[in-house]
Amino acid sequence: MAVPKKRTSASMKKIRNHSWKIKSVEKSLKSFSLAQSVLSGRSKSFYYGTEKKPFQKN
């Protein structure tokens, strides 16, 4: 199994962690914005039924 030859520096570790955190924040903001548009009824990219049908037993 391959093993790295040198230890990762602290600065490189911070850079990688920072980019990972930024990506997660961007995704969470995007999903929150999408949820807001769906709940407010202004969404143009989703089609969903607005009438509620009662549960029917067969």
Curated annotation (Swiss-Prot):
Entry superkingdom: Eukaryota
Keywords for this protein: Chloroplast, Plastid, Ribonucleoprotein, Ribosomal protein
GO cellular component: chloroplast; large ribosomal subunit
Record-annotated membrane-spanning stretches: none
GO BP terms, alphabetized: translation
A Pfam family recorded for this sequence: Ribosomal_L32p
Residues spanning the signal sequence: none
Compartments, record wording: Plastid, Chloroplast
Matches recorded under InterPro entries: Ribosomal_bL32 (IPR002677), Ribosomal_bL32_plant/cyanobact (IPR044958)
Primary localization: plastid
Protein name (record): Large ribosomal subunit protein bL32c
Source organism of this protein record: Adiantum capillus-veneris
Gene this protein is translated from: rpl32
